């Protein structure tokens, strides 16, 4: 059979499983691919195909992640599942697999456990917008009242981290029974798929967002002016558009007088394109790598922010010793390093390699910044951590 063409007809949504170890995240992932494949087509994946997750690198950090896909009536889903707790932490902080929504798997037999709580907190910090709950192993609990108690406990936990606990869909089922072909439990997998379709809104495509291009290089072309190059992160730039140059210095306004790609002139460049943008009346020395071109008023420069960070362990090539308050590494945003001073949370004396922690950072130069922006923490070019901006302070 010929290879199927990737159908772009259905909207594409990124999801992932989160939750405590051994509550059934990988079994549920297998059940979703297997049971939805029967009805909507696609490849079924067995537990052991998902469990031996390959290594991948994101922002200098090695993460084990499994990627599977499945279809529903109306959508195509890309789903990530991680083998270990540390992989989840790294995945969510680096944004290696940006999630439009998460499926929180919680065993009905155990109820919420420490990692259940930690994953919900992480989802909140890194900006996962929606959580849907799958209460797993319900076949092991024969008391309906107990199921109700666990459900209430999960809703309270979600609400305590500012998710709408009362409105989150909660599906009670058993991933293992569904995989074994129990019709009633298979139905619960379809119920979960329907909840994904209806509760997670279709994400806005990158090309529909306001224009942003991180500047990688700057050239001056005699008789034409200054050209900056980079990959358009989102939106579209048209010839004649007003744009702002944001970060590192005072924000400057300019106009795009030309877009070129592969030495050809275009009318526009869009998300994903590597382009050169010609700027009217801008001097070569006014622009540098690390700034961004953006649609006016859509992004502002900041120096102080709160972040959720993962610090590499010694085995991962990170630091061998803890760091303390006033630690001053470089923060690598998009295309450049900026030095910053770290303040720790109240009651935190030090941060050990291998930990994830909330910090406040004050940079020595402003960077175009918004919540959800990812960065690497580096010491002399060596990556020692990764982080995500959870809130902008100043």
Curated annotation (Swiss-Prot):
Binding site for GTP: 19-26, 81-85, 136-139
Any GO molecular function: guanosine tetraphosphate binding
Keyword line: Cytoplasm, Elongation factor, GTP-binding, Hydrolase, Magnesium, Metal-binding, Nucleotide-binding, Protein biosynthesis
Keyword Repeat: no
Reactions this protein catalyses: GTP + H2O = GDP + phosphate + H(+)
Span list, region G1: 19-26
Residues reported in the UniProt entry to bind Mg(2+): 26
Gene Ontology annotations for the cellular component aspect, listed alphabetically: cytosol
Region ranges (G3): 81-84
HAMAP family: EF_Tu_B (MF_00118_B)
Protein name in the entry: Elongation factor Tu
Species, as recorded: Neisseria gonorrhoeae (strain ATCC 700825 / FA 1090)
């Amino acid at each position: 059979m010929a290879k199927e063409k990737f159908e772009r007809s259905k909207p594409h949504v990124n999801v992932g499983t989160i939750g405590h170890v051994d509550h059934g995240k990988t079994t549920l992932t297998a059940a979703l691919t297997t049971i939805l494949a029967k009805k909507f087509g696609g490849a079924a994946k067995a537990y052991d195909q998902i469990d031996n997750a390959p290594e991948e690198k994101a922002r200098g950090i090695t993460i084990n992640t499994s990627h599977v896909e499945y279809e529903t009536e109306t959508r195509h889903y890309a789903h990530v599942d991680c083998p270990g707790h540390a992989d989840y932490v790294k995945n969510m902080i680096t944004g290696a697999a940006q999630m439009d929504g998460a499926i929180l798997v919680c065993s009905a037999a155990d109820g919420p456990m420490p990692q259940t709580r930690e994953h919900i907190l992480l989802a909140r910090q890194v900006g996962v917008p929606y959580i849907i709950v799958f209460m797993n192993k319900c076949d092991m609990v024969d008391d309906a009242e107990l199921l109700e108690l666990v459900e209430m406990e999960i809703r309270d936990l979600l609400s305590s981290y500012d998710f709408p606990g009362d409105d989150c869909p909660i599906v009670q089922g058993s991933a293992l029974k569904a995989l074994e072909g129990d019709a009633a439990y298979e139905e619960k997998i379809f119920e979960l798929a329907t909840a994904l379709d209806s509760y997670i809104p279709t994400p806005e495509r990158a090309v529909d967002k306001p224009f942003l291009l991180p500047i990688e290089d700057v050239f001056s072309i005699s008789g034409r002016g200054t050209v900056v190059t980079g990959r358009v992160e989102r939106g579209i730039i048209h010839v004649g558009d007003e744009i702002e140059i944001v970060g590192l210095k005072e924000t400057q306004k300019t106009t795009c007088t030309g877009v070129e790609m592969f030495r050809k002139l275009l009318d526009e460049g869009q998300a994903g394109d590597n382009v050169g943008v010609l700027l009217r009346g801008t001097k070569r020395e006014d622009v540098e790598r690390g700034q961004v071109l953006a649609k006016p008023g859509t992004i502002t420069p900041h120096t102080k922010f709160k972040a959720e960070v993962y610090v590499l362990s010694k085995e991962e090539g990170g630091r061998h010793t803890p760091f303390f308050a006033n630690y001053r590494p470089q923060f690598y945003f998009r295309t450049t390093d900026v030095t910053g001073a770290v303040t720790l949370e109240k009651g935190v004396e030090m941060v050990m390699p291998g930990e994830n922690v909330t910090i406040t950072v004050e940079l020595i130069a402003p960077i175009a910044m918004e919540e959800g922006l990812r960065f690497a923490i580096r010491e002399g070019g060596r990556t020692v951590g990764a982080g995500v901006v959870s809130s902008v302070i100043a």
